[in-house]
From Swiss-Prot:
This is Chitin synthase 8. It is a multi-pass membrane protein. The gene is CHS8. Residues 1948-2003 form the DEK-C domain. Residues 615-624 have a biased composition (Acidic residues). ATP binds at G108, D109, T110, S111, S112, G113, K114, S115. Residues 647-669 are annotated as: Actin-binding. The chain crosses the membrane at residues 929-949, 965-985, 1232-1252, 1604-1624, 1626-1646, 1653-1673, 1680-1700. It comes from Mycosarcoma maydis (Corn smut fungus). SUPFAM superfamilies: Cytochrome b5-like heme/steroid binding domain, DEK C-terminal domain, Nucleotide-diphospho-sugar transferases, P-loop containing nucleoside triphosphate hydrolases.
Length: 2005
């Protein structure tokens, strides 16, 4: 035995120091001995970073298992060196011999080899305990290692420190029967590092399985999964470029492992498909495209989105919405957060992490379902946690939790070694054998982290639960405040990212953690969008889905299954159980560790004892109980707290086991073999406390028992038979032990005697137990069988198939896969499907197979088992043999075209989506005609080609695309027509002529000198230069002398060179005439033949060719008058083909030429002087000045002769062309364009005159009309909305007569906002943040069930700069089941909320609950009857209104009763924000002062902007409804918006369409522009936003034009009505691109030097902009001239690019889920996924009926409370006719007593009397301000059911309003002639619904200045008053109808009250239909008694009221 082997244990070293331990470890390391024993229960392992030779081989394992089986002491004398195999064998030995559960714990730094040591220990235990081949449980020998390999592939990755680092904590329990046979296994996972899925560090890898799959999948599988190129996946990072060469082989091994544990092929394919979906998910890119959506990001690569959606079994649209929107529960309301590109990327990563972590949990639970047993006896647990982490880039929650686990484990080990048996040893009196050793105790560090309350984890969790009030910074402050003085804690400065940090001194080292997003990570939740999208909402059997939000989930059952696991905790909406509002994946394992009942301590199991049934082990799922309690207390489960709880439970379990520690060391930091660095190893020796533990465990006793137990157990041991120990008790037993100790020669180190117990070391215990084992015949037999099996395996040379050093050649894994199953054979081989068990069964076909049932160690429910583990994706049980597969086989081979989808794959999303609803709608004839025209225009584009484009899959979208193309073609045709008219038509009618009249020609002298030669005009100015070059002797002046002159005489011609005569031959001596030129320069150009000294016959022709090519500018032109003048001179001229010929000389010479021979020569006598045909000459002579074209062409001449004669005419006699420029057709062509131009300029001129207003804005008088200021809000910022609300509050108008009506369109958190928009609005208004009114139903716009919407109503008073204005806030929150953008239906729907309400108020129509509550709030809380309001001021949430605007608007209405709507000037508040806004300043200005001012002259402003306009609700005289007329409301509320036209009208330009409807239905009324009213709005400052805005504006303009065309009176008289002008104006929008092109043409024309300047066009353009400049000057808007210049520069953008872009993107909007197809008979079938809408879901009731019911009940409760009461009443009594609302699913309140809209649970709001004569809320309320006084009649017990804002009463009759007046007599309707004086309070309900006393002092508003006298009532007074009221029948609680409160003894109210009621009824009635009889009937019904005695009085009063109105 070597010296190294003699070192038995470190604890036995003579000098135990870190240095000596280091020396021993180093020497053994270099000797190839990585294992060293510290004591019997602690093993030290040094990671060799290389194969350990045969130290971990199967042969070595057999040596140690053989040693375990060996019971002969002599044969075991050669002790084997320490090894993990021996460690595992010892644990198994103790479990078998003591019956006590064991645990093997691996501790150490990362990269110290813990995972491999754990695998080896597991392997040894399996080898010791697995059943022999062919026996039940034999396949566990393959299945458990396979399961371990699967989890390793899913949970391990390559890091910088370790190539196979565990990224989760793994605790595995091997389960054994009482005979020690392995029967099952259970693995618990602790804290998977799921962030690695999306953000692995540089040079590190993602989880192994991704790389295995990408490298090892077959080509077919890669094709199916789309994973060809690993480097293309963002989630694989740079590490994908350095793929492990063994990854491919490991993937085959992984598939084999899945097969071994019983996973079906579909299961494995599904897992790979999810992994592929995650990889592709990481490649989805986002960009901030604000053209499509207002604030959210869009997908940049939709093809990747489609692929991911297909793999996940969902639609692409649903996935896109889930990625770009985020649903969050804020204050009990589901809100949607619009994500920008960064937010969407983070959300995408969250989905990837959630998918992977849930997949991991599902796989682990599946393995547990297949392997875990319930009926086991003992277990051995193996724990491996990730190593300690301290990152350089910053540590966060992941590192905190991992280090906390390491800290906890280290503390557990220290407690086990140093403290666990301290008290026991002291009690037994053997403390001297276990000396106290000082050691570094980390208990304080652990207390710092876990103290309850106040520990770091507790603080972290508490702060996370209170977000957003608490932040990372407040958490750090809390840390410092609580632990600032702790030695292990320090708050550090801000890190590099600017976030605070804190440092914890761990046992290993100090680690600094950043606080960045720590709270957010600690409260990490799974997005409910993803859960709802992929899991779906379970539906009750047999019920149809009628709600769009109830998603059916993924079509792939596997995807639904992983989201249905127990690990995912969900929270449902309080009002809808099927709506998930919160989901979290617990970091706790799905199962709990196995625990024992009490009495399972360190007692020894008796031999040969049979356990009774009541002594069976049991498991307790303590985690479930903890989870249940936690979920009740806190909705947010925090990661750190959950993890701590899981660890505590685990350590509690380990506390009950016998623990075996393996301390793993890392020899160096570089993962290099054969390197043992002193610094690294010594640091770990010190950290782990090896020297201290070695000294402590000098004497280690493994087993203790009483003396009686010792004697009883070992009485039959052969070595101790002489001692005779049987039946020894008490003192005798102690003596017997002493004797036995002497017999066995044990020292104190091996066995020691205590006070009542015996303590044995491992050596002594093994020695005694071996003798017992040797005497056990059954164990001897089993050991012999096992030894034979080992021998057979050794002979076959089998190896560990899952060893990291195993052979991984592809041919090996693919061809010899059966060898991997080990000595136990393939458990699935030669098994028929009949004999095979279901997937997940434990045994394989034996008759005595144990049935696997759910383990009670697991908390998994049966539901989960049924949902998740019933055999693959099909949902049916799967047999292994039927779906088993070879690793090399394509796992997707049999999936078919639909893949893993449950239904028809992705076709399900394009053809028949689940839950789709079909509705048939009619098609108008106009629509049919337009569709026919569209097809006629676009027939040449086949539909099958369009359908190949991703965005044109649906037929209705393709049809819209065709419509867009058709419209574009029509627009382009109109533009082409405009071009034709401008450019082509003139030339077509009058072709352009390049001719000059003699006058024009003569004028060309000087710089532009022209000259003429034989009718052709040349540019003499340019000719001079070239002539000077050729003939320099001739001065330029001599040449320029011919400017404007005919130069023909100086260019003599040679006749025979230019004319071939009649017969083709002309004598050279023949000349044109005998005339000699008198010009001296002619001689220089005379080269005729008779100049024999220099004859050049062709010189003239050549010169003319040169001149024509370079200098000709035209021809001489002669008009008819000019030709007549020539004829008057006796010249013979004629016109041929537009050319004028003069043959006068030829005729004068006798129809022939003249002869001229050279000097000294005579011409031949027979020379023929004729060269022209006599017939032609005769024709000219006979037709002087006429056109002889036809006659000449018809002459009987040979064609050759005729051609010669034409040439002769052209060369010799041409004098010019006929000038047609003044002909009628040319005049027409000229003046038609001028007329059109003048017409357009005239319109501009009228606009100019309209804009000329010299009057000064005067201050209007104060008016008393009631006005509603409507403000729709969507996602605007807080600052914008605050400015708008403040500007409306500050309007110089009576505050009591204006109402802020704010509609919040959905619970949406806009980009850049930290709260949902409704919360921002309410915070601005100062509403009570604790106020939670119930949501009430109303009818909304939307498809299907989305028409049922819900809203909350808030009301109060808003105070700003001395103004106190009442407000109503309508918060559209949607039904509880809505997830995406709850409540959001668009701006049009927000406008309709008020329009529909006012329409129903006017006509007294039944109202829905929301409208009734609005009515109540306005009438009974604010104190104004809704029918009093006459005007609606519409203002956008980003607009500020000038203070005097409202008064001026109303003045305009009052001046002209025909005005139905008007607008003011809207300027820019951000004019200089960017170049984009600068371009818009001038355009905004002229759109008002030119366009709208001009239209206003005709009373037809065609576009009243929604941002700043005002409408008249009804006519002032006849009370006819105008803006709220039913026809306008019905048209504007069009719900079917499914065509291109309606989309552009109602989705892109709703404001303009509203104006169109007003003009359409009320053509005789006016819409005007009021220049004195001004507002400021925010213009787009980004190019993309501007592009989107103008696209919507331009397209809506075009489509509104189509609507206006059919407006009656459009044509008017002679097409000169205003609407024709509007048509021309709108038409100019279409041809705007042509206008720009024309302007560019003009500019080019002007810039061209030789171009003629179009003076008229330039003058008109100058006039256009000059007039505008005049307007600016007159209005002193000097800066506008500069803005005009900026605008002119941007004309190409406004008039060219934007229109063209807009026209082509006319169909660029969201189409939603609605599809339109054609039915069988041609009808239109609308398909959508929004479910069906049942109108009966929304109850309706008239206000009168509702108010009567309230009278009957004498209740001031809100609508919600009444509905709740009705529901309860209906349940008990059944429904009854005429009752209040029927029960509504969405109308019920959360709590029965919680009244709507401001009901306070306590009387905290009644304490201070307000200035309005009632009780004002406390500090910070929305009412504010108070006066001195006290109130009477204050009853606290009733305060809970009163409205917080019901200042002055509720429903109880004439309730006091906010201003202290009875609502029906408020503001303008005097009560009994007393004006604003209040009525006696004995007939008016108080604030809380009780009669009030007469006020002592009247307030300015009619209430009590000093409150309601009398002070607060005492308890006795309250009781007395209540009794009196009950006696009078006023409480309403008795159930019977009680008389109205104002009733007097005689049964009828007072006359004054009757007058008030008459006025109220008349105000609510339609005067065109109401009669006196009907009014009396209403009064009689109201008073519930006969009114005959008052009939005359009532009739008289009715007439008085009508006469007043």
């Amino acid at each position: 035995m070597s010296a190294l082997d003699e070192v038995a244990k470190l604890s036995q070293l003579t000098n135990i120091t870190p240095d000596t331990i280091f020396s021993v470890l180093r020497d053994r390391f270099y000797a190839g001995l990585p294992y060293t024993a510290l004591s019997d229960s602690i093993l030290v392992s040094v990671n060799p970073y290389a194969s350990s030779g045969n130290r971990n081989s199967d042969d070595t394992l057999r040596e140690y298992t053989s040693d375990y089986r060996q019971t002969n002491k002599q044969l075991r004398a050669a002790t084997l060196p320490p090894h993990i195999f021996a460690h595992a064998c010892n644990a198994y030995f103790y479990m078998r011999r003591t019956g006590q559960d064991q645990s093997l714990l691996m501790a150490g730094d990362t990269s110290s080899g813990k995972s491999e040591v754990r695998r080896l220990a597991l392997r040894a235990l399996i080898d010791l305990s697995v059943a022999p081949p062919g026996k039940k449980g034999s396949k566990l020998g393959v299945q458990i290692p396979s399961a371990e390999y699967i989890l390793e592939a899913l949970g391990n990755s390559r890091t910088l420190e370790n190539s196979n680092a565990s990224r989760f904590g793994k605790y595995t329990e091997l389960q054994f029967s009482d005979s020690g046979k392995l029967v099952g296994a259970k693995t618990l996972d602790y804290y998977l590092e799921k962030n690695r899925v999306v953000s692995a560090a540089s040079s590190e890898r993602n989880f192994h399985i991704f790389h295995y799959m990408v490298a090892g999948a077959s080509d077919e599988e890669k094709q199916y999964l789309g994973i060809h190129d690993a480097a293309s996946f963002r989630y694989l990072g740079q590490a994908s470029r350095n793929m492990d060469t063994q990854d491919a082989a490991k993937f085959d091994r992984l598939k084999l492992a899945f097969k071994n544990v019983g996973f079906s092929k579909r299961n494995v394919a599904s897992i790979c498909q999810v992994l592929a979906a995650i990889l592709h998910l990481g490649n989805i890119e986002f960009h901030y495209d604000r053209q499509r959506t207002q604030d959210s990001a869009t997908i940049r690569n939709p093809e990747v989105l489609d692929k991911v959606a297909e793999y996940l079994g969902i639609s692409s649209k649903s996935l896109e919405e889930a990625l770009t929107y985020k649903t969050k529960m804020i204050r009990n309301e589901v809100c949607t957060i619009l994500l920008d590109a960064d937010g969407a990327s983070d959300h995408r990563d969250d989905l990837a992490k959630s998918l992977y972590s849930l997949l991991f949990a599902w796989v682990n639970e599946s393995l547990n379902e297949k392997l875990c047993r319930d009926d086991f006896d003992t277990f051995i647990g193996l724990l491996d946690l990730p190593g300690f982490q301290n990152l350089s880039k910053g540590n966060s929650l992941d590192q905190f939790c991992v280090n906390f686990a390491c800290e906890n484990l280290h503390r557990f080990m220290l407690r086990s070694v140093f403290e666990k048996r301290r008290d026991e040893f002291a009690d037994e009196g053997i403390s001297h054998l276990s000396p106290e050793v000082p050691y570094f105790d980390n208990a304080e560090t652990l207390r710092l982290m876990t103290n309850q309350p106040g520990g770091l984890i507790h603080i972290m969790d508490d702060q996370a639960r209170r977000m957003p009030k608490k932040t990372d910074q407040t958490m750090i402050e809390a840390f410092g405040k609580r632990w600032g003085n702790h030695p292990s804690f320090k708050v550090g400065p801000a890190d590099r990212s600017g976030f605070s940090s804190f440092t914890i001194s761990h046992y290993n080292s100090a680690v600094t953690y950043t606080s960045e997003n720590l709270l957010e990570k600690n409260s990490e939740v799974v997005s409910t969008d993803f859960v709802s999208l992929l899991r779906g909402n379970p539906q009750e059997s047999g019920k149809l889905r009628n709600d769009s939000s109830q998603s059916s989930g993924s079509t792939i059952p596997f995807i639904r299954g992983i989201f249905n696991t127990k690990v995912l905790k969900t929270q449902s909406h309080p009002k809808n159980d099927q709506t998930i509002v919160a989901a979290q994946q617990s970091v706790k394992p799905m199962r709990a560790p196995s625990t024992r009942r009490p009495n399972r301590g360190n007692t020894i199991k008796r031999t040969n004892t049979i356990k009774k049934a009541d002594d069976d082990d049991s498991d307790e799922d303590a985690a479930d109980a903890a989870d249940a309690s936690t979920s009740k207390k806190n909705a947010v489960r925090c990661v750190a707290g959950d993890f701590r709880g899981a660890l505590d439970l685990l350590l509690e379990t380990l506390e009950d086991t016998k623990t075996w520690f393996t301390l793993c060391l890392r020899p160096n930091d570089n993962q290099l073999p054969n390197q043992f660095e002193a610094r690294v190893v010594k640091q770990q020796i010190t950290t782990l406390g090896l020297s201290e533990m070695s000294r402590k465990l000098l004497n280690e006793y493994s087993v203790s028992m009483t003396y009686e137990e010792f004697c009883q157990r070992y009485a039959d041991v052969p070595s101790l038979q002489a001692v005779q120990m049987r039946d020894a008790v008490s003192g005798e037993a102690k003596q017997k032990f002493s004797a036995a100790r002497q017999v066995m020669s044990w020292s104190d180190q091996e066995a020691v005697s205590g006070r009542v117990k015996v303590f044995l070391s491992h050596t002594a215990f093994r020695e005694l137990e071996d003798e017992l084992r040797a005497a056990d015949a059954e164990e001897v037999k089993n050991n012999e069988k096992r030894a034979q099996l080992d021998a057979d395996a050794a002979a076959r040379g089998e190896s560990d198939p899952f060893s990291p050093v195993a052979v991984l050649a592809d041919d090996y894994t693919r061809s010899r896969s059966n060898d991997f199953v080990g000595a136990y054979g393939d458990p699935f081989k030669e098994r028929s499907s009949v004999a095979l068990p279901l997937v997940g069964r434990g045994a394989a076909g034996n008759e005595d197979d144990l049935e696997e049932v759910k383990s009670q160690y697991s908390g998994m429910s049966g539901t989960l088992a049924r949902h998740s583990f019933v055999g693959g994706l099909s949902g049916a049980p799967s047999f292994v043999a039927s779906e088993a597969y070879a690793p090399s086989r394509n796992m997707f081979a049999d999936m078919g075209k639909n893949g893993l989808n449950e239904k028809a794959g992705t076709a399900a999303f394009t053809e028949e989506p689940l839950g789709e609803v079909a509705e048939e709608v009619g098609v108008s004839s106009t629509r049919r005609k337009w569709v026919a025209l569209t097809w006629a225009i676009t027939f040449w584009i086949p539909s099958f080609i369009l359908s190949r484009f991703r965005s044109l899959k649906r037929p209705d979208i393709r049809m819209a695309w065709r419509e867009k193309l058709a419209i574009n073609l029509i627009i382009w045709f109109i533009c082409a027509c405009a071009v034709f008219v401008i450019v082509v038509l003139g030339n077509l009618i009058c072709p352009k002529q390049h001719v000059y009249s003699p006058t024009e020609f003569a004028s060309h002298k000087g710089d532009s000198s022209f000259t003429a030669i034989r009718g052709e005009v040349f540019d003499l100015s340019n000719l001079v230069a070239s002539h000077k070059t050729i003939v320099p002797v001739v001065p330029a002046n001599s040449i320029l002398a011919y400017a404007g002159e005919d130069a023909t005489p100086i260019f003599p011609v040679q006749v025979n060179a230019l004319c071939n005569g009649v017969d083709g031959n002309v004598s050279p001596w023949v000349q044109l005439s005998n005339e000699n030129s008198t010009d001296k320069h002619a001689q220089y150009h005379d080269f005729r033949s008779y100049h024999i000294d220099d004859a050049r016959p062709d010189w003239y022709y050549e010169s003319m060719w040169l001149l024509r090519s370079n200098y000709r500018v035209g021809f001489m032109g002669y008009t008819t008058d000019g030709i007549r003048d020539i004829l008057s001179e006796g010249r013979a001229v004629a016109i041929y083909r537009g050319d004028i010929y003069d043959v006068s000389d030829y005729i004068k010479q006798g129809n022939q030429g003249v002869l001229r021979a050279p000097d000294g020569f005579q011409a031949p006598a027979n020379t023929n002087r004729k060269f022209m045909s006599d017939a032609i000459i005769s024709l000219i002579a006979q037709n002087p000045g006429k056109d002889i074209t036809k006659q000449l062409d018809n002459l009987p001449l040979d064609p050759v002769v005729l051609d010669r004669q034409r040439v002769c005419l052209r060369n010799l006699y041409f004098i010019g062309k006929v000038d047609h420029r003044n002909s009628p057709q040319c005049r027409f062509a000229q003046y038609i364009l001028l007329a059109l131009s003048l017409f357009m300029v005239a319109i501009l001129g009228f606009k100019f005159l309209a804009a000329l207003q010299f009057g000064r804005a005067r201050k209007p008088e104060d008016h008393d009309k009631f006005v509603i200021c409507q403000v729709p809000c969507y996602t605007e910022g807080e600052e914008s909305m605050r400015k708008t609300i403040n500007s409306l509050a500050a309007l110089k108008y009576d505050d009591k007569r204006k109402l802020l009506f704010i509609i919040c369109d959905g619970m949406i958190v806009g980009s850049g906002n930290d709260r949902p928009t409704p919360r921002i609005v309410l915070d601005i208004l100062g509403a009570d943040p604790n106020l939670e009114p119930e949501a009430l139903s109303f009818l909304s716009l939307g498809e299907g069930s989305k028409q049922h919407n819900m809203a909350k109503i808030y009301s109060g008073l808003y105070e700003h700069h001395g103004h106190v204005v009442p407000y109503i806030v309508v918060v559209k929150c949607g039904k509880p089941s809505e997830r995406s953008r709850p409540g959001n239906r668009g701006k049009r729907d927000s406008q309709l909320v008020l329009m529909r309400f006012l329409n129903k108020v006017h006509f007294g129509l039944p109202m829905n609950p929301m409208e009734l509550e609005i009515y109540h709030q306005i009438k009974n809380v604010i104190g104004v009857n809704p029918s009093f309001y006459e005007y609606i001021l519409q203002v956008d949430a980003d607009t500020e209104v000038e203070a005097m605007s409202l008064n001026r608007f109303i003045s305009a209405f009052i001046r002209d009763k025909k005005v139905i709507g008007l607008c003011g000037e809207t300027a820019l508040s951000n004019a200089k924000a960017s170049i984009i806004t600068m371009l818009q300043v001038y355009e905004y200005y002229i759109s008002h002062y030119l366009a709208k001012a001009f239209e206003s002259l005709f009373g037809s402003v065609t576009c009243l902007p929604g941002c700043f306009s005002m409408f008249r609700i009804r006519t002032p005289d006849t009370h006819r409804p105008l803006f709220i007329a039913s026809q306008i409301v019905e048209d504007y509320a069009e719900n079917r918006v499914d065509t291109l036209h309606t989309k552009n009208l109602l989705h892109l330009g709703e404001d303009r369409y509203l104006t169109t409807l007003v003009l359409k239905h009320f053509g005789k009324y006016k819409t005007i522009f009021v220049r004195d009213c001004k507002a400021w709005t925010v213009a787009p400052d980004d190019w993309k936003v501007l592009l989107s805005q103008r696209r919507r504006w331009i397209n809506s303009t075009v489509h509104n034009l189509v609507e206006l065309i059919f407006t009656p009176g459009l044509c008017g008289f002679c097409l000169f009505s205003m609407r024709f002008i509007v048509f021309i104006d709108l038409l100019s929008t279409i041809i705007a691109p042509v206008t720009v092109c024309y302007i560019v043409y003009l500019i080019v024309l002007v810039a061209t030097a030789n171009g003629t300047v179009p003076l008229t066009a330039i003058i008109m353009l100058a006039a256009i902009y000059g007039c505008q400049a005049v307007i600016f000057l007159l209005n002193r808007k000097f800066e506008m001239i500069g803005w005009m210049i900026v605008y002119i520069i941007g004309i190409p953008i406004w008039s060219l690019f934007l229109p063209l872009y807009s026209f082509w993107h006319m169909d660029d909007f969201s189409w939603g889920n609605t599809r339109v197809v054609m039915g069988e008979k041609g009808q239109k079938v609308v398909l959508h996924e929004e479910g069906t809408f049942d109108p009966s879901e929304i109850p309706l009731q008239t206000w009168t009926d509702y108010e009567n019911e309230l009278w009957e009940r004498n209740s001031a409760r809100s609508i919600g409370s009444i509905i709740e009461a009705a529901r309860a009443e209906n349940k008990s009594l059944g429904s009854r006719a005429g009752s209040q609302y029927a029960p509504s699913l969405y109308g019920q309140p959360m709590l029965p007593h919680n009244a709507s809209f401001g009901h306070s649970p306590s009387p905290s709001y009644g304490g201070t009397p307000s200035q309005f004569g009632a009780f004002a809320p406390g500090p910070g309320s929305q009412i504010g301000g108070s006066q001195i006084g006290a109130g009477a009649g204050y009853f606290p017990q009733d305060a809970a059911r009163q409205s917080t804002y019901s200042i002055g009463g509720g429903y109880g009759g004439q309730a006091m309003s906010m201003y202290g007046l009875p609502p029906s007599s408020s503001f303008g309707v005097p009560t009994g002639g007393s004006g604003f004086m209040p009525q006696p309070f004995n007939t008016t309900a108080s604030m809380y619904g009780y009669p009030q006393q007469v006020a002592a002092t009247q307030s300015i508003y009619g209430g009590s200045q000093l409150g309601f006298g009398g002070g607060f009532a005492t308890a006795e007074q309250q009781q007395q008053q209540q009794q009196q009221q009950q006696a009078a029948g006023l409480s309403g609680s008795g159930g019977s109808k009680s008389p109205p409160r104002e009733a007097v003894a005689g049964g009828l109210p007072s006359d004054s009250q009757i007058k008030l009621d008459i006025r109220s009824l008349i105000a609510e009635s339609d005067l065109t239909t109401i009669t006196k009889k009907q009014l009396r009937a209403k009064l009689e019904q109201k008073y519930a008694t006969s009114i005959e005695s008052k009939k005359a009085f009532i009739n008289s009063e009715i007439e008085n009221v009508l006469s007043e109105s």
